[in-house]
């Protein structure tokens, strides 16, 4: 299974969103050598004013794979971006994990992951996706969702029109 979360994936996501002229949001990116490090999201109001909404920070490993996506939200009362949550990506031979950690403002640090999603190769053109959530009362994780995702492979269809 090859990594699907690369610099090119993040760049494509940004350009697809930014080029939709009818979208209610506007995007501003920090792009350096074809690599997106930050995206700011603003909502377009009816009076053509822009309202800050979200800010995303991206980090990559030496292979160009996404390792961290930090999400910040705009705090209107403080007039500044504040940490919200973080996705951390860990890559393995047969897939990758995505861990979600929430920001603890009292500790000024991210908590231990509250959710972990495992993406694993399950066969040709198939990926197993399992999500585990933290059970706070028992201090362990439980399986909350499991599915198989199949890629469309038109060349392997048995019938044609």
Q: For each of these PLM feature ranges, what is it?
A:
Residues 1-10:
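Sec-dependent signal peptide recognition
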